[in-house]
Amino acid sequence: MTTLTPILTRNWDQADSFTRAAYEREGGYRALRRALGMPPDDIIQAVKDSGLRGRGGAGFPTGMKWGFIPQGDGKPHYLVVNADESEPGTCKDIPLMMANPHVLIEGIVISSFAIRANHAFIYVRGEVLHVIRRLQQAVAEAYEAGYLGRDILGSGFDLELVVHTGAGAYICGEETALLDSLEGYRGQPRLKPPFPAVAGLYGGPTVINNVESIASVPSIIDNGADWFAAMGTEKSQGYGIFSLSGHVTRPGQYEAPLGITLRELLDMAGGIRAGHRLKFWTPGGSSTPIFTDEHLDVPLDFESVGAAGSMLGTRALQIFDETTCVVRAVLRWSEFYAHESCGKCTPCREGTYWYKQMLKRLEAGKGEEKDLETLLDLSDNILGRSFCALGDGATSPVVSSIKLFRDEYLRHFEQGGCPFDPAASTLWGGATK
């Protein structure tokens, strides 16, 4: 039985967990003092040795990404933290920044020192004003204590940190669209190469990492790369925050080693809501192919989830019981992607629009089996042809739902409407059963 590993979340139950005093009480900023006494390249090597992979979805090795930054080039280097958490079901970074913003700030200072960056940015969703205020308060506290600014802790290292508010576009979670937005332009993905490590923010070498990725760095420096690498699986090392939402008794954030299964997490969360059973779930948010109860024992690591036909993504585990219409769920996700498409490329702009139109008609029972083949053909014209991964992600729930629940689509056509009571899947609907 895998057990939880509260590291990033260990002080969330403290009333003042978001303050500098509470963070220092738990050993906060100890790793920073150690890091400032190390050669920057040794920090990068430690992160490589730990096996830390990006926690924002792609799972790219963090230390390797840092190593791409050219040194001795005479250009200013930048660190950008992607806190534009916007995908349906993904809800780990916002509570982390609310409950423990100083672990992120400490990670930013260490990471910036490692890549020789003197300017860092936290790009936050514009809608989460409470998080923005919490971050700004924490940054001010860090400046007051000498953890930010000039000559940090007498090391001679300078770092300016800016909390930047986005305008609410999901596309700005794509790293190059985020850079465009940060520079004051409309957020749209850039052509790669050149990659941000060579020509990123303002044309300078830039590292872009997820909140949880950067927040994991202090524990690696404090406890050692071997400590981190000992957790998780052989190729997916360390711990992560798993977000359980939907039809589960105790939804929330569960921090555990990678490789834990949904069955184990559901046991910790009290199981599916009383009187119901699991129907389908997402392992990594709405942009990942859905799983069913047959996948309860798939280890939640990058390789195992990929081998089973989906992606670990952001570990946003959306749980749906048998009262949920899979067609309606896929329609809701498709409406989101159609609304959030930036419009730059034709496959995504037109494809997500037609997803929405077709699924709305099919959910109402106005379709036939050949329409499913049209949806799959449409998916083939989006997947791999869109300018960025947003288009690819939009195809995942559509294709996987047709593969796993074709009969449910056909029931809509046979009955001339949705066979599910929409109220039954709600919290109050479930309570009346």
Tell where the protein language model's regions lie, with residue ranges:
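Cofactor-/ligand-binding subdomain signature composed of acidic, glycine-rich
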Residues: 1-44
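Histidine-anchored nucleotide/phosphate-binding helix
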Residues: 100-114
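Hydrophobic alpha-helical positions that pack around
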Residues: 132-258, 270
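Short amphipathic, charge-patterned alpha-helical segments
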Residues: 107-111, 257-275
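Conserved phosphate/anionic-ligand binding catalytic regions in large, soluble enzymes, centered on
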Residues: 49-69, 166-180, 184-186, 338-350, ...
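Short acidic, glycine/serine/threonine-rich loops at helix termini
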Residues: 58-59, 64-66, 90-93, 132-137, ...
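Ferredoxin-type iron-sulfur electron-transfer modules in oxidoreductases and energy-metabolism complexes
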Residues: 30-46, 75-77, 83, 90-97, ...
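Gly-rich Lys/Arg/Thr-decorated short loops/hinges at beta-loop-alpha junctions or inter-strand turns
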Residues: 23-29, 81-93, 196-201, 243-248
